[in-house]
């Protein structure tokens, strides 16, 4: 069963955006979360699909990052849940193949943390521009 991990202590005032990051593996989540937080994002970390579903029901996010330790089925379902909670939420799937209608961008997580961060920055900027119009 999934559980919600402690939230980042970063102030929302300096945040680049609020992201929900979901993985099944806590160590992987901790490592990648540090990269996102270091870039100025407020990160809500959740472990497993049940915790992510709960988070989508109770919160709104600029982006959702679905990690590579989730199963293909979990990533597939959670992408829909992210969009159901808010059409404006950008969905980034790590280590995915193929195109899913609810996924805004998919990237091979083996590309490295900096490339993942670059894509996340692009997605959050796109959301900000779309909301400004």
What are these regions (language model features)?
Residues 15-26, 32-36, 64:
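Conserved acidic segment of CheY-like receiver
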């Amino acid at each position: 069963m999934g559980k919600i991990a402690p939230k980042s202590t970063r102030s929302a005032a300096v945040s680049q955006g609020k992201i929900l990051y979901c993985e099944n593996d806590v160590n992987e989540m901790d490592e990648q979360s540090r990269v996102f937080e270091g870039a100025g994002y407020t990160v809500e970390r959740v472990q497993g699909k049940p915790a992510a579903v709960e988070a989508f029901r109770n919160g709104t996010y600029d982006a959702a990052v679905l990690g590579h330790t989730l199963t293909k089925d979990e990533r597939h379902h959670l992408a829909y849940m992210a969009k159901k909670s808010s059409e404006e939420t950008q969905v980034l799937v790590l280590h995915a193949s193929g195109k899913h209608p609810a996924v805004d961008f998919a990237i091979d997580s083996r590309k490295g943390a900096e490339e993942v961060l670059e894509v996340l920055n692009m997605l959050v900027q796109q959301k900000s521009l779309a909301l400004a119009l």
